């Protein structure tokens, strides 16, 4: 199942983040999950209730030719080691691009 996590669920992806990004310190993870995740949209793929793949859409304000727009950049792109090479991330990327197009995001 592919879906966006609700605000109160975002902490569920911390274990996957730590597996995928072992170089990130505990302090950084604490900061990121407390402060940066507030505005993120976290798109996940779940199998049997477990998050197996995720990506984070971070909103970013851009200025171009005198205009301002909000554009998401993608971070936290990861899949459990056991779930790799199964097309999980491909399905998330396609869903995200479709959503961003529907939102008319630049």
Predicted regions and their residues:
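Short amphipathic alpha-helix that is part of the acyltransferase structural core
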Residues: 1-53, 57-59, 66-73
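Short coil/turn motifs at secondary-structure junctions
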Residues: 60-62, 82
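Intrinsically disordered, low-complexity acidic/polar segments
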Residues: 64-66, 86
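Conserved acetyl-CoA-binding loop-helix of GNAT-fold acetyltransferases
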Residues: 76-79, 85-101
């Amino acid at each position: 199942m592919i879906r966006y996590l609700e605000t109160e669920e975002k902490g569920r992806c911390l274990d996957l983040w730590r597996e995928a990004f072992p170089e990130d310190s505990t302090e950084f993870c604490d900061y990121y999950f407390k402060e940066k995740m507030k505005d993120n949209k976290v798109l996940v793929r779940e199998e049997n209730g477990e998050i197996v793949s995720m990506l984070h859409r971070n909103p970013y304000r851009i200025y171009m030719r005198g205009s301002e727009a909000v554009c998401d950049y993608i971070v936290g792109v990861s899949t459990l080691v056991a779930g790799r090479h199964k097309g999980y991330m491909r399905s998330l990327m396609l869903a995200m691009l479709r959503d961003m197009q529907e939102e008319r995001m630049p």
